[in-house]
Amino acid sequence: MEKKFLTWIHAGSLNFFGLAKYLQNEIGGEFFAIYDITEKPKKFLREQKLVKFNKIWFYDEHIKKNHFSLDKEYLAEFERKYNIHLWKLAANERIFIFNEFYQFSTNEILSIIEQECKFYEKVLDEIKPDYVLMLRPHFHYDTIFYQLCVARGIEVLELGTTRFPNRSSISSKNPSYNFSEVDSNKKSKLEIEYERFEITETTRSFEELQKYRKNNLSFSTGTDYENSPKHFISTGLEYFSTNNEIINKNWKYFGRSKFKVFFNYINEVFKQKRRQKFIEKKFLKKIDKNDKFVLFLLAVDSESSTLLDAAFYINQIEVVKNIVRSLPIEYTLLVKEHPASGLRSWRRIDEYEELINSPNVIPIHHSSNTEELIKKSSLVISISGSTLLDALFLEKPSLVFTNTDYSMIPDIKKIDKIENLSKTIKDALRIKVNPKNIEKYIQFVEYNSFEYNLTLHGLEMQKYVFGGSLLVDIEFSEEKMNEFFNKTKDEFDKLTRAYVKKISS
C-alpha cells in the first residue's frame, strides 16, 4: 500500500515543494500539501504540473475574519484530548502580541485557533497521512499542527539546521516544543538516544576541538546574491504599486494598509537611530577589569527561540534581575545585546535604562567580541542561543533556560525551576568542562545529520523563485521554479537521500 505524505509549505520552505517532486521519483506514494502562502503565488500552485499533489489546501482560506461563534467546549476538549496548551502558544504568538498594525481581541484569537484546530483535524481525518514533512515551526499555528500530528501518532519528519550550519538533521520530535515530558522534566527521546550513544574515536584536545568549531561555525559556501540599497528602493516601489487585497483575506496581514506600512517604516528608521545613539553612549565595548564575571547573552525579542522554546522567559530584563539576585556576591553580571536586535529596531530605551539601573549589571555593546567576553567570564548564560555551545569549546560551563538540541551535554546546566536559580548557578560555576562531553556531542550530531546547508539553500530559493525580491506576495512561474530545481539539484539530491534513508529506516 502506498505511503501518504503531507507537506507543510510556506514561502520560506519551498525546498519542500522540490523535495516532494524528488521523493515522488524515488519512492512514489501519495502526496498532499498545506500551503501557508500569500495570494499571488496561489495561481501557480493550483495549476502547476511539476509536482503531483493528490490534494492541496491553502491554510489562510480556512481562517475567516468574521467567525465569532466560538465553541470553547470544542477547544477545551481539543486541549484535553491532545495535551496541547493552546493559550501557552497563543499568548506568545508574535503576530498577536508584537503587532504594530492590528490589535487582536481575545475572541478574535480564540476564533482563529478554533478554526485552525478544526481545519487540521479535518485534513488529518480525510487523508490519514503516514508522514508529515515540514520545517521547524516558528508560529503558534504551525506548532499546533506539529503537536497535533505527533499526538495522533503521525510521524513528523522535521527538517532543521544543526548547531553546525553546514549540517542538517531530520527529527521526528524536537526536544524544545514543551510537550508533557518536557513540562514534567521527563527525558526526551533525544536525551535518551544521546545517553545510549557511544563515542567511536579518541577524544580530541580542547585546541583541536576549538579548531573544529571554527571550521564548522560559518557557511562553507557563499551565495552570489545580496540586497543592495537600489534593490531595496525598487522593492518598495513595487510594493506600493501592487494590489493590497491580502489585508482583508489573511489574518496575519490585518491592518497592514500601505499608508500604515509606510509611516511605520519611517517611524522605525528614526526609532532605530534614537536607540542606537543611546546604546553607543551607555553600553561598554570593552571590559578591561579582571573581576569575576558571569556573562548573559540577550536573545532577539519576538523570536521563536524565546516565544515558543522558552514561553515563560520572554521578559529578558526580568530574567537579568533574577540572575543578579542569584549570583554569588563576588560576581558581576555582563549583559551583551544581540547584534541582530538592530533588525527589530533594538529594544525600547526604557528597557535599556532598567537594565543599566539594575545593580551589579554591566551592559555590553553588541559589537563587542563575544569570544573575548566568554574567556573573561566564569559562566555563560542564555535563554537558548548557540553561543552556550561555543562557551564549552572555550572551556567555560553554560546555563540554559529551556530544552535545546544541546542541553543534554553534562557541562550545560538547565534551569528546572526559577526558585532554584541560585543553586543552579553555584553548581554550574563548579563545573570543569570535559572535552569528552564535547566530543560525544559532535559525534552524535554528525551521526544523526547530513551535509546540507538549509540557510544557503533558502537564499538560493529567494534568488531564483522570488527573483531576489524582498516581497513574499509575488507571482511564481514554472520557469523560475525549474531554475531553482536545476541550479540547486545537488542540494535537492542531498535532501532527498536523507529523507529516503529516514523513511526507510
Regions found by a protein language model. Give the residues of each.
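Nucleotide-activated donor-dependent transferases that construct or modify glycoconjugates
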Residues: 1-13, 35-37, 105, 133, ...
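Histidine-anchored nucleotide/phosphate-binding helix
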Residues: 9-27, 146, 312-327
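Conserved N-terminal ligand/cofactor-binding loop architecture of enzyme catalytic domains
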Residues: 22-120, 161-273, 493-494, 498-504
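Conserved nucleotide-sugar donor-interacting segment of glycosyltransferase catalytic cores
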Residues: 118-181
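A donor-sugar binding/catalytic signature common to diverse glycosyltransferases
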Residues: 135, 160, 366-413
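C-terminal amphipathic helix plus adjacent low-complexity
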Residues: 191-249, 279-283, 418-505
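Active-site donor-nucleotide binding/catalytic segment of nucleotide-sugar enzymes
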Residues: 288-317, 322-324, 337-341
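Catalytic donor nucleotide-activated moiety binding site of glycosyltransferases and closely related
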Residues: 321-364
